[in-house]
Amino acid sequence: MAEGSYRKESEGYNVEDMDEGSDEVGEEDMVEGNDYEEFGAFGGYGALTSFDIRILRAFGSLGPGFRILANEPWELENPVLARTLLEAFRMDPETLANETAARAANVARAAASNQAARAAATAARATYNQVVTNHHPVATHQASGGDTQPMTSAAQAPAATPETSVASPHSSRMLVNSEMAAPGAPARSPQPQTSSQAQEAAAEGPSTACAFPQASRASEMDATRPKTAFLGQNDAFDFSQPAGVSGMAFPRPKRPAPAQEAATEGPSVASRGTQAASAGEGAATRPKTTKSGKALAKTRWVEPQNVVAAAAAKAKMATSIPEPESAAATSQQSAEPWARMGGKRTKKSKHLDDEYESGEEEREPPAVPPTWRASQPLLTTARPQVAPRPSMALRSQVPSRHVLCLPPRNVTLLQERANKLVKYLMIKDYKKIPIKRSDMLKDVIREYDEHFPEIIERATYTLEKKFGIHLKEIDKEEHLYILVCTRDSSARLLGKTKDTPRLSLLLVILGVIFMNGNRASEAVLWEALRKMGLRPGVRHPFLGDLRKLITEDFVKQKYLEYKKVPNSSPPEYEFLWGLRACHETSKMRVLRFIAQYQNRDPREWRAHFLEAVDDAFKTMDVDMAEEHARAQMRAQMNIGEEALIGRWSWDDIQVELLTWDEDGDFGDAWSRIPFAFWARYHQYILNSNRPNRRGTWRAGVSSGTNGAASASMLDGPSTSSTIRTRNAARTSASFFSWIQ
């Protein structure tokens, strides 16, 4: 396979399986549309090699699914390195066992939770049915006895006993409930009851006959106080009122335009008596049963309890009439459970003393005049009583059918994902292009996106303790991250010895910008570079195209900002310090670099020196605040030294492969990682066996007799920890040696 070519391999991905090895990322999806520059860690400048494809595949799975393409020149030439990479990326058997056990525990926990939810729902329904049976025996008896008791004659209906004719408070309340349960009964003319009505009632059975005196008594009671009314056709539901048990407000279904509508002049005493009498006729609308026991008649739509309570409260507020008994009855009814069961288009609700189950297409709205409340006169100014909100205990009787089962917080799995993020960050930082949070979530975090703060904090802790570098978020809006080597002054900018020419040029550009008031026009910058023998139209043997390097590469890497000068004609551009430059270096370092080249004291530039000191103090305050916040976050997440305990996959790599070689093979993946990182990692390995030298390593000094950090803040960090890094510092100080 030729370099720069790639092959797409797509495999299925199962989120519930949580198997990292089965999640392969297609190279075409990762590389397409970014001109190979968005993935700055892979390949040379502007080229994607075959080994980059293998690295992409490795970080797509990082588990048992890691494979290297067969019959490739790189593997034939470096069989030992290929075998070493396979051993490095192969996951520890103990870790695989832990992941398998955690996955099995997660599946078992989800199954147990769903089973418990189903059992709780079944128990709640059984308790609910038992409460209905115990508290409403009269309704059950009336519902069942309407078809089984013998028929009575018309003469028996008016000759009822005084106990039957005189309605008790409980009977009248049940009658009012029956009015509310069957509000859709057609309105009668305001005429007294005739013998034909009595005969019709006698034909229906004694239960209907007994309802007539109760209806008469209820109409007399309604003459002294207003009846609870439903919302009209053009009235909107008041969502400010307390909701029912389920916590949801169900809107009323749309009313069809009735052909026969009652007059809108407002309910009179006679019309109220007619409505009460029609409630007795509502008993005749109970569905008849056939041989199969199925209901033939359609049941009418029943308003939910929260709608009833809200309508009653709103009606009382409009009429300003005290209604203590009706409010108590309504609040007692609203306290009963109301459950919306899952299904296609079916609702099952508990309303008063009957259960209704109907589809939306079978619901019929009540025939209530829309202007009833508007025509009701104001009689008194008593303060209305608002129905109380049901308690949380009643609300929790019916559990939700959909139980959200989140994956458990497994510290071992989170630390493994953090270790993968460390490798991903170090390799992708190869070209110094800021790393996006979206790329980390897509390539490494994946299904653990809910634990992203903890994973990235664990990765930051590992980077600090093992490699001596920090993960910085330089842009809070776009969420861009960079790696900063805080202990090594020569590795802060660009970070590699092969980039020494770029490092020197960048320091010169930053110095020109700083000495010209923190902004330099393009003409001023090129004039300074011409004095050094650098011209924009001439290709440099080490730097290549200078204009592209300064206006594109350094801008992409966030070392510089290239902006258009406002209100300039013809258009002019200027350079400023970028976000990465502000984090990787400081104004004091740049000023000391310029003074070292000219053999002068930085204090001779008094204004710039004071500005650099002020910038150093501000940076120190920001770093201290971030360190304090980071310490608190790690204490809450229990992140400590245990994050460094365990097998690290790079420990098995041969030592010679971890050493940077300027003339070495650039196909080696480990040579792509900045040399200063590996120097820090080797120093961590050495000091881990010598606890007395751990403080020296953290101070940034690993060789010589300078065992303590510099006493002066202006002196900056100490010297490099290796000979190659010291040579890079010397070369950057005397940059004229390679320019000429």
From Swiss-Prot:
Residues 185-207, 321-337 have a biased composition (Low complexity). Residues 1-27, 139-208, 242-298, 321-377, 697-722 are annotated as: Disordered. Keywords: Tumor antigen, Ubl conjugation pathway. GO terms for biological process: negative regulation of transcription by RNA polymerase II. Residues 1-11 have a biased composition (Basic and acidic residues). Transmembrane segments: none annotated. Gene3D superfamilies: MAGE homology domain, winged helix WH1 motif, MAGE homology domain, winged helix WH2 motif. Residues 414-612 form the MAGE domain. Residues 141-155, 162-175 have a biased composition (Polar residues). InterPro entries: MAGE, MAGE_WH1, MAGE_WH2, MHD_dom. Interacts with TRIM27. This is Melanoma-associated antigen D4. It comes from Bos taurus (Bovine). The gene is MAGED4.
